[in-house]
């Protein structure tokens, strides 16, 4: 049965403006009439950049905390590039590392504007790559919709402009790029990521040790794949960020919920072209309900707004789904995964929130920010067939825990 995005009624209690509702429908109509809907497929990759010298440590972290494993490595004029994969039908993960510590481009400049991002000026979630039947036609259509794309003279990194991908400019609203690719990501020779390289044996041994730990503790069948990813934006830019993403993708606006305890909202966009969100993970935008200067009248919590003021508009966390079930150790699978990772030295922001008894529900937890990517890793277990991405009480607890870890103390302002 074909999904009808035009007649779909978004879920949730977050009220959107008449402007948002009008243009949400207009965007759906234009995607279809322009041919964009027919050209776009599921999300095929996510891209992250780390600082020079951090790539191997970050790869070890990824091996420990999730299902991604190295498929190939490349070297371009400016970067080492690592292609990781999990299941064939799930998006790939591309990690970029500048060849020199002095490397500077638009990511560096963007990070330097924010006090808690400046310490890792080249570390950033870059964006997603969507499958395209004809990426140049996608670019042509989107440029006619006032979406800007990078060309080779506009940025130093050849992955952005001279590879098999075409990438948009970083969004003014989210800081994220969106890329498009018509080639098979398993055809490494066609990707144009640079010269393929072999990693030193000592690096491969490090990765093998982490992989062996994961297999010995049976983490690999439990942590299944990317479930969703959440970008934090400013209060006044929530609707614009969502509408821009809908313009550039084939996702639909699934729904939005107020998280009153944290004075924020969670806004979810999903792909209708897949039956499993892990094949094309949901895109979530979170934002404060009021800007900081207005919020000061009532002194309400504002950890989401504070994050943007301290780190900038950017991806906040990537969430892995944990297979639902009772572990042999007498606890839920997510509790076992988290306990095992804690014993290995992985730090978490709080205890697992939520409960799984006899009714459908969720258990979730946030790790602390990665020292390499600045991203938080979330684990989520949907118990008894729970449908959805969160409960309000879980999100409130997770947001509060993250907010305590994301403060910037200066002068008389503690945010």
PLM region spans:
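Long, well-ordered mid-to-C-terminal structural blocks that present hydrophobic/aromatic surfaces
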Residues: 248, 252-325
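Charge-rich interaction segments
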Residues: 204-212, 222-227, 231-245
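Hydrophobic, helix-prone linear segments
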Residues: 38-43, 50-104
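Amphipathic alpha-helical segments
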Residues: 54-69, 139-145, 237-254, 336-344
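Vicinal oxygen chelate
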Residues: 1-39, 41-53, 70-75, 82-95, 110-142, 167-170, 225-236, ...
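Amphipathic N-proximal alpha-helical interface segments
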Residues: 97-99, 105-107, 181-183, 279-297, ...
